[in-house]
């Protein structure tokens, strides 16, 4: 077991989930849709991308860009790309009556090869 913290050592910091941030990730779709029937592969891949974005960015509201949708569906419903490079942007919700303060926008990043790619923070332009 880890040693117990003393009572007065609590840090009051604000959660990083409330900050606006943009990162690029490589998602291995292949392992996420392994064993899925042919006619459900592309739809499941999009659900898995949505789930990945929800987990990484901590926002229940995830919006997928049309170019990403086209990239997943480019080879048809059965032959989904093995990997895909995406940019996840956590943004403030402009809609006042929305239950969520933030949403995540998932956009497609075309790359020639996936070798030696890391998750990177992207500066807001």
From Swiss-Prot:
The modification Phosphoserine is found at residues 15, 98. It comes from the Eukaryota. Disulfide bonds: none annotated. The modification N6-acetyllysine is found at residue 75. PANTHER family: 60S RIBOSOMAL PROTEIN L31 (PTHR10956:SF0). Component of the large ribosomal subunit. The ribosome is a large ribonucleoprotein complex responsible for the synthesis of proteins in the cell. Belongs to the eukaryotic ribosomal protein eL31 family. This is Large ribosomal subunit protein eL31. The gene is RPL31.
